[in-house]
Swiss-Prot record:
Factor involved in transcription-coupled nucleotide excision repair (TC-NER), a mechanism that rapidly removes RNA polymerase II-blocking lesions from the transcribed strand of active genes. Acts as a key adapter that promotes recruitment of factors involved in TC-NER. Facilitates the ubiquitination of the elongating form of RNA polymerase II (RNA pol IIo) at DNA damage sites, thereby promoting RNA pol IIo backtracking and access by the TC-NER machinery to lesion sites. Monoubiquitinated at Lys-432 in response to transcription stress; this promotes efficient transfer of TFIIH to stalled RNA polymerase II. The keyword Hydrolase does not apply. The gene is uvssa. It comes from Xenopus tropicalis (Western clawed frog). This is UV-stimulated scaffold protein A.
Amino acid sequence: MDQKLSELVEVLTTSGEPQLNPEKLKELKKICRSSDEHINHVYHLLMTQLNQEHAEIRLSAFQIVTELFARSHLFRTLLISNFQEFLELTVETDHEQPLPPPKEVAQKMKILAIKTVQEWHEKFGEAYKKLSLGYHFLKQNKKIDFQDVRSRTQAERKREEEKQRRLENIYKEKVKKATAEMEDMLEEIQSSLTEMENCFRLLLPDPREFAVFTDEKDFASDMRTKPTSQSPSHSKSTSQSSAYSKSTSQVSFDNDDEQPCCSKNLPPFPSSCTSSASGAERSLGEGAKESDKSARKSDTDDSDGDYEGSREAFLRDHGLGSHAYSLSLEISTDLKVNENENNTDVLNNLMDAHKLLKQKYWPAVQSWIQLFTKAGTNSESLKCAIDVKKEIEAALKKYKEMNIDCHTKERKVMTASDDDDDDDEFEEVPEKEGYEPHIPDHLREEYGLEPSASKQPGKKTEVKRPNVPQVPPSQKRINDELNPTCAAATMKTMKDKMAKALPGSSRNAGEPKSKCPKRETDLSQAPVAPCGLDLHHWGEEQPSAGKMLKFSSLHRFWAPNEVDEEVESKELEALVKTRYVTLPGKFEPVKHKCLAPMPNGSLCERQDRYKCPFHGKIVPRDAIGVPINAEDRAREAREKFEKQGEEQDWRDPELMREIEQATGVDLGSSKCPVKGKGKGVKRNLKKKYPNLTDLKQKANTSRSRLEKKVFNTGSVKRVISAMNQADKRRHEKFANQFNYALN
């Protein structure tokens, strides 16, 4: 029955489900109801499962504890006697022993445990003093708010407060740096905005800046006075207006020169005259006013008649039927600025300022606003940043609306053709007097040059036709090649030597093929053997064989060369004239196999001559791998017994697995050899509880994927080889320089 209880508890706690299996739980309750010993055994099994480092196992075990706590007095007594350990394993009262992963399941179990303890206190608190003490301990000492849904302890609150305080300090430092940066860059941003605005005004001036008439009444009165100046009755009004203007000018202006010259001869407007009249004119008598009114009335009637006549004459002269014409003009709203020689500099400055705003200042202002918003500061810095952002947006929008069409800037790169053109400029320069580019033959040796090929007897000059057409050298290059002190002369000499050596070698190599075809055939069929001095001088006298120079004095210059003596050595002569020929014998291939039994049940197929690197000395075996000789069988049995005796008794995989289940400590049972054949047993042991969350499995995050690629064995080897090559090149380059060697 105890075995049945253990199996039920293990199945229920390792299911990995959020809710227990009702049938299994009912069967467990039925067994516990039969005897108190079973309850005691179940209690120890559940406490063992609560000590497991897996939150899903603890949650299932806690659910079983809740079911049995409500139905058994003995189980309540056993649990309350060890209530402190129970709270540490479920409520996390000891912050040094946090709940195991997965984190979500652990948090769920903690909330459920606190609610359950509160229910137990309300139901059984009066009967069990330790339960009441545990409840007050959680409430008063651990500061657990049982009404709080999150059920945070005092340690959790303290951690949250420290985290929040740390974040606030970080944001304060960032805001301080951003404010200082904004103060430094604000002047530059305003300067760029002002520069863009000035460029906009230069490219598209405002029409209001060029308005001549500021009032429609002035424009209408000016248009009306123009035709009246042509009438015959204008002389009378002109004299009156001139007198009137003269009097007003004396009153309103101290000096007539202050009045603009373009407005001196214009007739004064009635509205302007009345508005600029002085106090002396206002004091005129009523009689003068009435006479002026009558005169003005007569002048007005005459001017109206003249205006009508001039209007009809204007229509007749211009071929117009009437003034009642309506013109509809279609004005294109699409704006486009084309680049020309007049606005190139302005556009360049505008584009530079636009690039600076868009690529540097715009991202900086956005980051400032984002930082100030996250920090929650409603200071002047945030308002200033928002205003600057609006100004930048307006400038960028205006630049986009202008639709600027700029020419593509082509960057001119100096090429070899440009250098040739520069060299061609010097071709027409006359040579200096007395300069002889040709070096005589008797002076060529003094300059380090070979004698000319044309003067050597018995040699015919060969005419070489290059495959690639060469560029005709310039006069400057020819002069450099003829000057023996220049590097060009040395290069030309080396090229000439190589050109002479190549045709000669090819010609000599081609002669045997045409002249001695039989010799070539014999050489191809002849065997090749290593050649020594004895074969090299076969059948010839070797005068220097076995002779050595003996120096009576080891000094470099005290003894003359004639004093050197030759000594014959018989040993050296014997070595030169002796030849050793090895006769290894006939090769016999290996026909036997190792045939030692393998762990997978097969036999070793290695064909070594004397010793197998895996199974030792090769001995004759039968078809199933058992040694034929009795001595070999006894030796293998003795070695196997000694190997088993070296292993410790407690390292039994099954015993280690049971200890790990009871204590929750990994003793390394998975690394021990498993009894049985094949790989199925090991696979089943690894997946003993497939429903539980695998804690060793890494989360599939971007960091883990990058780590898998970066720390891959092949990648690491490639990086190491590249670094070694770089160090090797650096060492080869600066090996003899102590300054670089110490770095």
